[in-house]
Swiss-Prot record:
Function: Involved in the export of PMA1, possibly through the monitoring or assisting of PMA1 folding and acquisition of competence to enter vesicles.
Entry's Gene Ontology cellular component terms: endoplasmic reticulum membrane
Signal peptide: 1-19
Subcellular location: Endoplasmic reticulum membrane
Lumenal-facing ranges: 20-191
Bilayer topology annotation: Single-pass type I membrane protein
Family matches, as InterPro entries: Sop4
Official protein name in the record: Protein SOP4
Keywords: Endoplasmic reticulum, Glycoprotein, Membrane, Protein transport, Signal, Transmembrane, Transmembrane helix, Transport
Gene designation: SOP4
Keyword Repeat: no
Annotated glycosylation sites: 32, 85, 120
Lineage start: Eukaryota, Fungi, Dikarya, Ascomycota, Saccharomycotina
Membrane-spanning ranges: 192-212
Source organism superkingdom: Eukaryota
Length: 234
């Protein structure tokens, strides 16, 4: 029994790697997360090789989906190096069929503090084309902005303000109120005002004749007098 315990301690000393959970949350801002969003949103995590580490390295990847309507997701038992000041890098890719997520690429940096201590996790807003570069300190073309973690030490992913939704279905035959001359009139304030004026001029005599025939008769007589006055003056 003592020999088994001794071998276990030696293995822990030689191989300081351990499992770690990376947690995140999706914040839609415009509304709450729905069951439909859960089925159409997912995240991929890839480990990046540290160029300063000459030890044996194996590729690693993991996928995760939203767990609940709070937008939470977790990458469980992610292998990291817990040695003191030993750094492990990951890149996180965000995918959704409904939204344009921000940041779409995240560089995750985990620095070990020893076998019995919680490692330090830092995140940076990454960009397309350099998501597999394992360092936030690159000076060309630009440095990466830190991504703040929330009170529960989770990554926060949001939607882009200018393009929050994606439309994959285009209506081939829209209604008359959405396309054509009628839609053009309804979308233009000046055209709509002109049409309303013409309709009013056409309907006003008819409505006046129906609801106030005496006034309509007086107006016709006044018009006849003006016409007769023109001929008399000539």
């Amino acid at each position: 029994m003592n020999f088994v315990l001794f071998c276990f301690l030696v293995w822990q000393f030689v191989n300081p790697g351990a499992a770690f959970d990376i947690k995140g949350r999706l914040d839609l801002k415009v509304r709450n997360v729905s069951r439909h969003d859960i089925s159409r949103t997912y995240f991929n995590l890839y480990r990046i090789r540290n160029p300063n580490d000459d030890s044996e390295w194996d590729s690693y990847s993991q996928s995760s989906k939203l767990e609940n309507i709070n937008g939470e997701f977790t990458f469980s038992d992610v292998p990291i190096d817990t040695g003191i000041n030993r750094t492990t890098y990951f890149t996180l890719h965000s995918h959704s069929n409904e939204f344009n997520l921000k940041p779409n690429r995240i560089l995750i940096q985990i620095v070990g503090n020893g076998q019995d201590q919680e490692p330090n996790l830092s995140a940076f807003e990454n960009r397309f084309g350099r998501e597999y570069f394992p360092s936030p300190d690159i000076t060309y073309p630009e440095t990466l902005n830190p991504l703040p973690l929330d009170s529960a030490n989770r990554l926060t992913i949001t939607t882009m303000n200018k393009q929050p939704y994606r439309k994959y279905i285009k209506i081939r035959n829209p209604g008359i109120l959405e396309s054509g001359p009628i839609a053009s009139v309804l979308r233009s304030k000046f055209k709509l005002a002109g049409v309303v004026t013409v309709i009013f001029l056409v309907l006003f005599p008819i409505l006046l004749e129906k609801f106030d025939p005496e006034t309509a008769k007086a107006m016709r007589q006044e018009k006849m007098h003006r016409e007769n006055a023109k001929y008399v003056s000539k």
